[in-house]
Amino acid sequence: QKRAEEGVGGRPNRWKWECEQFRDYVLFMSNTGLRPDEAARLEFRDVTIVQDWDTQETILEIEVRGKRGTGYCKSTAEAVDVFRRLSARQRKRQEPGPTDPIFPGGTPRELMNNVLGELNLKFDREGCRRTCYSLRHTYICTRLMNGADIYQIAKNCRTSVEMIEKFYAAHLKTTLDASAINVRKSTKLTFRNGSDTLPAQAPAALSS
């Protein structure tokens, strides 16, 4: 964000476009869960801004084209303004066509690596290297920690529940709902002749 606003080398407009584009790449990826190769193939015709019936939020519906074929993704509401900025930024240069790539520079691997290096964030707590793919991990972990259904996450990310459980098991404990696990079937009581031991919908043999 700071680099996008201030530019590089004391020149406010130097690399401004690239820095703003990178910032929105990070936000877009962490709010859609796309793989880097899927985002690199993404064209403007693949993304539609819609009103979601279930949540009544404005979101993105994305037709994802990857090595695994074509799938579909629904973004978070936060991705909408990001997409609008990406589209507007393209128009400043040239009106984007339906088949133009949303990220014309492809996957910003080198820039991501440089930024992570500057922030001393190249490796996570387990010593694994962070990459652009880590933004997909961010999306999945955030959804899990906010209580989203793991089956719906798997479907939206075009993967399996088994894969999510394998790679994100450490985060699954935060999704366990104690109220759902420790559920007790409630018994409705009715008072009859001073007794409170009969259920409200007792069998006919007991209530006769």
What are these regions (language model features)?
Residues Q1-P36, A40, I59, G97, ...:
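Basic, Lys/Arg- and aromatic-enriched nucleic-acid-binding interface segment
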Residues K2-E6, P12, Q51-D52, T70, ...:
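C-terminal secondary-structure termini that scaffold catalytic or DNA-interacting sites
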Residues D24-E38, N114, S134-S160, T174:
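C-terminal catalytic core of tyrosine-transesterase DNA break-rejoin enzymes
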Residues L42, L111, V115, N156, ...:
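Residues in the recognition helix of alpha-helical DNA-binding motifs
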Residues D46, Q90, L119, G147, ...:
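The DNA-recognition helices of helix-turn-helix-type DNA-binding domains
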Residues D46-D54, R129, A148-F167:
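Short, polar N-cap/turn motifs at the start of nucleic acid-interacting alpha helices
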